[in-house]
């Protein structure tokens, strides 16, 4: 492990952290658990001159559920440890897909340090596919106010200066017949990447017609993305062999990961398509 050479700043509120970031600019980075930056440093990335630690900003440690507009939401402060996401009874009971995703992240020692905010801030975190299909929002402090941004939009835009304050996840009230899945393919010891991470929620009505479909895929150094074309293909259709064949083709086409020295892009796409087909077959069995 490399020796830390950066100067550490310890602000106690959001405005102070923001002011430091504006003052130090590109020579600085926000840091919480540190596992994200440790990953980058182990791969040879240079250490910044200044690190702005967020660990003394208590507002970022909040975790609660709140109703808004008739819907229930989970509010996760950016400093909530990944391990706490696994242990918290509310999350386990009402947001099990998030629990399942977090359980796959690295080793227990890393989860004890790593934060949910850091996992999202990485833009390639394993929790992101699950958060995408639950249509989570990100709370970001812009120096004046905390704004809410759809996670999907946040990933597709550049918000490099944003200070993530919380992740807000709506509760999905779905019938037991719906298929909820999260799969991570590939070994992940310490800081090595996965082949594919994919999540989905798919449901059908009493007539066997698909009336709910959300899919998201990522893996390795690839930013997770919603598979909206595939979702549209599924809407209003019944699970049958012709549809399964078409879905495999569309997932393979829509999912556009980058390959590396270990796994080609086509291999990742094929794995993602195979997983979606397997989950659709489970839905067919419930019909």
Where are these regions (language model features)?
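C-terminal structural segment of proteins
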Residues: 1-287
């Amino acid at each position: 492990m490399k020796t830390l050479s950066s100067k550490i700043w310890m602000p106690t509120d959001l405005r102070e952290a923001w002011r430091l970031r504006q003052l130090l600019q590109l020579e600085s980075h926000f840091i919480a658990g540190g596992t994200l930056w440790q990953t980058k440093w182990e791969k040879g990335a240079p250490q910044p001159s200044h690190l702005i630690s967020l660990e003394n900003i208590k507002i970022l440690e909040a975790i609660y559920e709140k109703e808004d507009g008739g819907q229930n939401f989970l509010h996760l402060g950016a400093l909530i440890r990944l391990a706490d996401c696994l242990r918290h009874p509310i999350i386990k009971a009402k947001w099990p897909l998030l629990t399942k995703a977090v359980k796959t992240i690295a080793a227990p020692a890393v989860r004890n340090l790593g934060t949910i905010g850091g996992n999202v801030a990485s833009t390639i975190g394993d929790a992101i596919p699950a958060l995408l299909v639950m249509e989570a929002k990100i709370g970001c402090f812009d120096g004046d106010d905390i704004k809410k941004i759809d996670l999907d939009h946040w990933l597709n835009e550049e918000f490099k200066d944003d200070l993530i304050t919380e992740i807000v996840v709506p509760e999905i009230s779905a019938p037991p017949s719906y298929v909820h899945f999260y799969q991570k393919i590939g070994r992940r010891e310490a800081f090595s990447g996965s082949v594919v991470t994919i999540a989905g929620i798919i449901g059908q009505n009493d007539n066997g017609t698909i009336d709910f479909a959300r899919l998201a895929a990522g893996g390795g150094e690839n930013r997770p993305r919603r598979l909206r074309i595939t979702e549209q293909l599924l809407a209003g259709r019944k699970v049958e062999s012709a549809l399964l064949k078409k879905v495999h083709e569309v997932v393979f086409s829509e999912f556009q990961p980058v390959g590396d020295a270990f796994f080609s892009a086509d291999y990742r796409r094929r794995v993602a398509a195979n997983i979606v087909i397997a989950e659709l077959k489970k839905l067919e069995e419930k019909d």
